């Protein structure tokens, strides 16, 4: 497994959610996972479908959540930010039991590939 150090520098403010400001990775093989979407009635249901897909992609390369060094999240509605944060608050301690949450960039955009999708999450992992 790659040597990964996820941390928050003292010179930066505390993260606003389940993420860290910095992921330092000693040169490693990288795994780029395309943005994942999932149908569902609301943001929680869609997140509950998206993250297992990411996990399957990680497992296909012999990796797991501990290999993730970056998430990029796209939301269609700013009012879904609290629901997305609640999902992470509930699920990330199980996925990242050491509390080293990967950096995450969250963008609110006009729409995704199909109107039914509310969230898309892309991941980068170091192997």
How does the language model describe each region?
Residues 1-70, 75-127:
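N-terminal presequence-like segments and the immediate start of the first folded domain
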């Amino acid at each position: 497994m790659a040597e990964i150090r996820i941390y928050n520098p003292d010179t930066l403010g505390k993260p606003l959610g389940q993420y860290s400001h910095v992921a330092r990775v000693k040169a490693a093989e990288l795994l780029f996972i395309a943005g994942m979407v999932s149908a569902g009635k609301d943001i929680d249901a869609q997140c509950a479908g998206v993250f297992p897909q990411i996990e399957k992609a990680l497992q296909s390369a012999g990796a797991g959540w501990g290999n993730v060094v970056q998430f990029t999240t796209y939301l269609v509605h700013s009012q879904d930010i609290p629901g997305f944060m609640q999902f992470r608050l509930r699920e990330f301690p199980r996925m990242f039991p050491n509390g080293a949450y990967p950096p995450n960039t969250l963008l609110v955009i006009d729409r995704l590939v199909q109107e039914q999708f509310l969230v898309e999450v892309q991941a980068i992992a170091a192997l």
